[in-house]
Amino acid sequence: MAATAAVPGAAAGRASKRGGGGSGGGGTQGAEEEPPPPLQAVLVADSFNRRFFPISKDQPRVLLPLANVALIDYTLEFLTATGVQETFVFCCWKAAQIKEHLQKSKWCHPTSPNVVRIITSELYRSLGDVLRDVDAKALVRSDFLLIYGDVISNINICRALEEHRLRRKLEKNVSVMTMVFKESSPSHPTRCHEDNVVMAVDSATNRVLHFQKTQGLRRFSFPLSLFQGSGDGVEIRYDLLDCHISICSPQVAQLFTDNFDYQTRDDFVRGILMNEEVLGNQIHLHVTTREYGARVSNLHMYSAVCADVIRRWVYPLTPEVNFTDSTTQSYTHSRHNIYRGPEVSLGHGSVLEENVLLGAGTVIGSNCSITNSVIGPNCHIGDNVVLDQAYLWQGVRVAAGAQIHQSLLCDRAEVKERVKLKPYCVLTSQVVVGPDITLPEGSVISLHPPDAEEDEDDGQFSDDSGADQEKEKVKLKGYNPAEVGLEGQGYLWKAEGVNSKEDEELRQSLWGLMIKTEEESETESEGSVDPEELDSRAGSPQLDDIRVFQNEVLGTLQRGREENISCENLVLEINSLKHAYNISLKEVMQVLTLVVLEFPLQQVDGLLDPNRYCALLLPLLKAWSPVLRNYIKRAADHLEALAAIEDFFLEHETLVTSMAKVLMAFYQLEILAEETILSWFSQRDTTDEGQQLRKNQQLQRFIQWLREAEEESSEDD
């Protein structure tokens, strides 16, 4: 709950701010134009999400090392190079660690041109809370930069700042924010899918007219009014990367205070655009083409940005520059982007192929192959080790014969002999794995038991919340050798059991992918869509289309039954709907399967028991089997249909005893093949609910019957 000392001039800023102050304001009357006030920045040193859990259980995201430099140091170097003279760093999670790091850094040295003031509170839950505190404390006196502490950039912000100030001068403070974006193709590695946006922008003024996140969308809709009466034209932009850098007027903090529903910048942007005609506020865009800016929002972005730093795309923020003035950051740079720190030892026959950073005091054994990797200080690598896109932090030990591919090993993690880490693995601090074990793709191992997270919910933003209790749990709960090896220390994290909407982000892995089975990931959104979820996605065109398509298919089948329409004509109608709503064949198959299974529920008021449900469904399956067979053809289609059937019965638990009869009907009608049913039943990488479903006695008897039938068929052959 600590705060900084009063900021010089803050009281004056509070007195004048409500009058629309800020650079370019109407305060000067007849006097000479004053030079712009010192540039300030608000740096948010918290992400307010758990995307980096369990890594960030040990240290805050802004202190995670990227190319052996803490993320926040890149951000502060960017702000200082931009000309920022005063930066307010707002901390919540692990605030003591951030404060200690900054106080030991050059940023808190008396000679620093950028005065860093640290403000901590356990009450911050969002960007909105931070900006409301900025307003309450009257910290900003003019236009300021708003940025997160995990942004890496070399953008010269001066031009954007001049444009912003000029607009506010000419248009009487109408423009409240200028967002900085970079031109970037949709397929570029540093485009984070979660941050992708499509915008409508005034061609002449760069005023943002429409702003929409595109994650998961296939079609975009724009109000027709955008294109009416715009003499200078409107540009639709999908070639932009969000740098997460915003130039804000002082009114921004006040607007967050006035609108408590604003929690994120996106909330703010949508609110301003929605109320532009009423309040008169506008948001503008500044686009850079050659400079660099990106936010490390997940480990996919961590990997991409780290590679860009090593490949010198963020010059002058390159490893050998040592912009932090640290004695351990003295690197030499050689061909193929090989960086070596002091006192590095490289064994006989070891090859550093390209894009490799070796931290100070690191020892590499003989006959190692290292490429596209970052190794922190004081690491020890044994003989015959392969590192490819590996990110090793401080003090990591890798024993002989290990192979690490596209994975992250945090401080003092240890990999024993002959361990293989497949892509997207994460070992958090002090984890030990091995020997002689292969970690599957996407494995996350931590010394913190996954179930300890439930106990943290009430105090998740406290630096020491639940620490003592968690240590006791570690003592009581042993490690699983099947997961971490005979000498391993750590727990395998899984996210399949997370169901609450508040914790939905925990279903996102550290790498920006989903931690779930392949079948689950391919069918997650194409089935029935919860209306509340639909509302929460702000009218997503893709979800709207799937929902409408599902209703249209239901109507088509109802009409087909009433009017005795042939299956051939039903297929033609469904295909026309498919093209009208731009639905993929996979989505058609999944929606059709669900609609058929749900059809009896739509026709009867009240609950159905399993016997009555089967009595209603089986004649429908027989009648519509040609339609289903038209879409369920390949083995992959069969598995998708089975996943949709599984989802249906997981959602309708009272009908689960009828599942065996339903699958028998699908089998006898030759919609599903016995080998794919057996393959589906034998899947191990499924949810706990899916495993429980497979324990149903009727289902197990049906599977046993199928296996015996398959064996008899094999004997006859």
From Swiss-Prot:
GO biological process: astrocyte development; astrocyte differentiation; cytoplasmic translational initiation; hippocampus development; myelination; oligodendrocyte development; ovarian follicle development; positive regulation of apoptotic process
Residues passing through the membrane, by range: none
PTM summary: Phosphorylated at Ser-540 by DYRK2; this is required for subsequent phosphorylation by GSK3B. Phosphorylated on serine and threonine residues by GSK3B; phosphorylation inhibits its function. Polyubiquitinated, probably by NEDD4.
Modification sites for Phosphothreonine: T318
MF terms (GO), sorted A to Z: guanyl-nucleotide exchange factor activity; translation initiation factor activity; translation initiation factor binding
Biased composition (Acidic residues): 452-467, 519-533
One Pfam family named in its UniProt record: W2
Job description of the protein: Acts as a component of the translation initiation factor 2B (eIF2B) complex, which catalyzes the exchange of GDP for GTP on eukaryotic initiation factor 2 (eIF2) gamma subunit. Its guanine nucleotide exchange factor activity is repressed when bound to eIF2 complex phosphorylated on the alpha subunit, thereby limiting the amount of methionyl-initiator methionine tRNA available to the ribosome and consequently global translation is repressed.
PANTHER family: TRANSLATION INITIATION FACTOR EIF-2B SUBUNIT EPSILON
Complex and partners: Component of the translation initiation factor 2B (eIF2B) complex which is a heterodecamer of two sets of five different subunits: alpha, beta, gamma, delta and epsilon. Subunits alpha, beta and delta comprise a regulatory subcomplex and subunits epsilon and gamma comprise a catalytic subcomplex. Within the complex, the hexameric regulatory complex resides at the center, with the two heterodimeric catalytic subcomplexes bound on opposite sides.
Name of the featured protein: Translation initiation factor eIF2B subunit epsilon
Organism: Mus musculus
Lineage: Eukaryota, Metazoa, Chordata, Craniata, Vertebrata
